[in-house]
Amino acid sequence: MNIVINVDTPTFEQMKSTYQAPGTLPAGAAFHAKLKGVTVTGYTKSHKVMFQGALANQEAARWQPNDAPAPSRSTPAPAGLPAGFATWSVLGSDEVGVGSYFGPLTTAAVFVAADQVASLTQLGVADSKKLTDPEIIRLAKQIMATCPVTYLNLMPAAYNARMKKYNQAQLKALCHNYVLAKTLERLATKPQAILIDQFVSERTYFNYLQGQPQIVSHHVYFQTKGEQAHVAVAAASIVARYQSLKAMDTLSEQAGITLPIGAGHAVDLIAAKLIRKGLDLNQFAKVHFANTQKARQLARQ
């Protein structure tokens, strides 16, 4: 169970004295203590205090006056996930670049231990689509400095070669399996669960992996909008987007022009310019997209 309360400055300082303990503090925390049945973490800027564990409610009640509003509880786990899943130690994976013509297909996996969940949430780790590029860069660097991370940038030439053999969903499955397996190899303590941001059914996902030498299949859960189910998937989406941004900068430099995100008409115009410059779209873009034919038509005009 998670309980979060807001306290005034005198109470916060009193709690800081009560729960002060040796050891490294989570990012943004003023104090962090593991007691029997409960872990307590207080955050400096917000004066929010999180209680995690079976005795969270009882411990939080010590600091709440009788007429205070009820402390906020963590949201229930989404359907299909165990109760309390959001507080587990989880290895999460997500990908970006699927719908973008230029750039790589980037997949990342991030392991978040149970005692890191609160600090990453407090930092603002959330769905990467809701964050600005500067926020992505800041958060990704913090995630990569504190959590085990694996990412795979499947650059356009490599992506296009594999698309001759696989469909895009199968290629995504292979990439997720790869980054999950590589991260698991580095973990001294195995996660309580693995959460994949769902893009196909569980059955189809594992069918796509048949014949692979290593298949991650134990304690695996699938969830659409996985970043809302656990911060590990949100962290993975941020790392993936960060690495994708870096790759796009490199490709733009090679192309001599800023390559746009997405697959709209602006993309067609830039792709046509690359063709006119004599550059090979295979090195910059996912050429199976309809944008390729549109760009070729524009380049002939």
UniProtKB/Swiss-Prot annotation:
Keyword Nuclease appears in the UniProt entry: yes
Names of required cofactors: Mn(2+); Mg(2+)
EC number(s) on file: 3.1.26.4
Main location: cytoplasm
Catalytic activity: Endonucleolytic cleavage to 5'-phosphomonoester
Residues annotated for a divalent metal cation binding in this entry: D94, E95, D197
Subcellular location: Cytoplasm
Free-text remark on how the cofactor is bound: Manganese or magnesium. Binds 1 divalent metal ion per monomer in the absence of substrate. May bind a second metal ion after substrate binding.
One Pfam family here: RNase_HII
Residue span(s) of domain RNase H type-2: 88-301
Domain of life (superkingdom): Bacteria
Gene Ontology MF term list: magnesium ion binding; RNA binding; RNA-DNA hybrid ribonuclease activity
InterPro entries for this protein: RNase_HII/HIII, RNase_HII/HIII_dom, RNase_HIII, RNase_HIII_N, RNaseH-like_sf, RNaseH_sf, TBP_dom_sf
Keywords (A to Z) from UniProt: Cytoplasm, Endonuclease, Hydrolase, Magnesium, Metal-binding, Nuclease
Entry GO terms, CC: cytoplasm; ribonuclease H2 complex
GO biological process: one example: mismatch repair
Role noted for this protein: Endonuclease that specifically degrades the RNA of RNA-DNA hybrids.
Family membership noted in the UniProt record: Belongs to the RNase HII family. RnhC subfamily.
Stored PANTHER family: RIBONUCLEASE, RIBONUCLEASE H2 SUBUNIT A
NCBIfam families per UniProt: rnhC (TIGR00716)
Protein name in UniProt: Ribonuclease HIII
Gene for this chain: rnhC
